A protein has these predicted regions:
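S-adenosylmethionine/decaboxylated-SAM
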Residues: 1-156
Length: 156
């Protein structure tokens, strides 16, 4: 079974690309827009999926919000060290012993550095890591880069 949880506070409903040569018309993006996109693009009829949309500040999430422990987290949130650490500390309570953390905007070196400082501070073991970097807002790649790290809470 795949248990998927999506969370956002929808604080940037009209977020636009920084590059002027990219023309995307994004207006009034809300939780309803996200749910509609899910319904149009994901077929769960033949697959064992549990998809939940959690609306609100991700730093307030806890084990109570999840039916299953999480083994993949895609963090695409506030890039301040305070908010990233706040979320990362909370996520430890609802992740499996081995889990994958994907951090968006890895082209911003500080985002990767913040994540690595958290990993060290929590004593997590890195089983695998990779930085997927590319040009800023690359529509054919990872937009602003990804940092992928497989972590273990135990020392193995």
């Amino acid at each position: 079974m795949v248990a998927a949880y999506a969370n956002d506070n929808w604080s940037q409903p009209n977020l636009q690309p920084a590059r002027e040569d990219i023309n995307l018309l994004l207006e009034d993006v809300t939780v309803d827009t996200f749910v509609q996109n899910l319904q149009e693009n994901i077929t769960t009829d033949s697959l064992d999926f549990d998809i939940q949309v959690l609306n609100g500040d991700s730093s307030k999430l806890g084990k109570k919000d999840f039916t299953h422990n999480v083994n993949i987290i895609f963090y695409d949130g506030d890039n301040s060290e305070h908010k990233m650490r706040e979320f990362f500390i909370n996520m430890i309570d609802f992740t499996e012993d081995v889990f994958t953390l994907v951090v968006d905007d890895a082209n911003i070196e500080e985002n990767v550095a913040i994540t690595k400082r958290f990993i060290d501070a929590m004593g997590l073991k890195i089983l695998y890591e990779r930085e997927l970097l590319n040009d800023q807002e690359d529509v054919d790649m990872w937009w602003n880069g990804l940092y992928v790290v497989v972590l273990s809470k135990s020392t193995l």
